[in-house]
From Swiss-Prot:
The keyword Nucleotide-binding does not apply. It is found in: Cytoplasm. Pfam families: RRF (PF01765). It comes from Syntrophus aciditrophicus (strain SB). GO terms for molecular function: ribosomal large subunit binding. Keywords: Cytoplasm, Protein biosynthesis. One of its GO terms (biological process) is translational termination. PANTHER family: MITOCHONDRIAL RIBOSOME RECYCLING FACTOR PSEUDO 1 (PTHR20982:SF3), RIBOSOME RECYCLING FACTOR (PTHR20982). It comes from the Bacteria. GO terms for cellular component: cytoplasm. This is Ribosome-recycling factor. InterPro entries: Ribosome_recyc_fac (IPR002661), Ribosome_recyc_fac_dom (IPR023584), RRF_sf (IPR036191). Responsible for the release of ribosomes from messenger RNA at the termination of protein biosynthesis. May increase the efficiency of translation by recycling ribosomes from one round of translation to another. Belongs to the RRF family.
Length: 185
């Protein structure tokens, strides 16, 4: 029974960290990254289709993304989809491929992005703490039903706290790494 609670706790905490990393990937830094285009879908023959399913995406230079559609008739749809996105990217269509130059971030924008990623990290910590609370509630319920003793409950809660501290530390490490990436010129 306790193993199920710990497995669920670990699973929830892993999901929280993965969600944090995924949301960090969508934050634009000064570098070109294909993950910037993850949420963008082009209207391909009337169907909203992810860019990676209609074109080859690559990063030939540190500040440029190259989109080579398999079907050149999709060029305009891809270009429109990028312009509609709120990423502030300007696509350059040369008739065969689309190039997106990533402009360097201003100091003010960098500081703004750091605030955004800190908020995301704080939301992740809240998710981790909620998972901790749920696990502790499970153990209290088990104690109430006399499935475990008071001492066992406290031991399990200590283990839950250690696991929570470990995952919060991991989220801090991810945050520090992202802040460094954003502030890098």
């Amino acid at each position: 029974m306790k193993d199920m609670v710990f497995d669920e706790l670990k699973q929830n905490m892993e999901k929280g960290l993965q969600a944090l990393e995924k949301s960090f990937n969508k934050v634009r830094t000064g570098r070109a990254s294909i993950s910037l285009l993850d949420g963008i879908k082009a209207d391909y023959y009337g169907t909203p289709t992810p860019l990676n399913q209609v074109a080859t995406l690559s990063v030939p230079e540190s500040r440029q993304i190259l989109i080579s559609p398999w079907d050149t008739s999709a060029l305009n749809a891809i270009e429109k989809a990028i312009q509609k996105s709120d990423l502030g990217l300007v696509p350059n269509n040369d008739g065969k491929v689309i190039r997106i130059s990533i402009p360097p971030l201003t100091e003010a924008r960098r500081k703004e992005l750091v605030k955004v990623v800190r908020k995301m990290a704080e939301e992740c910590k809240v998710k981790l703490r909620n998972a901790r609370r749920d696990a502790n509630e499970e153990f209290k319920s088990m104690k109430k039903n006399n499935d475990i003793s008071e001492d066992q409950m406290h031991d399990y809660q200590d283990q839950v706290q250690k696991m929570t501290d470990s995952y919060i530390e991991k989220s801090e490490d991810i945050l520090v790494q992202k802040e460094k990436e954003i502030m890098e010129i």
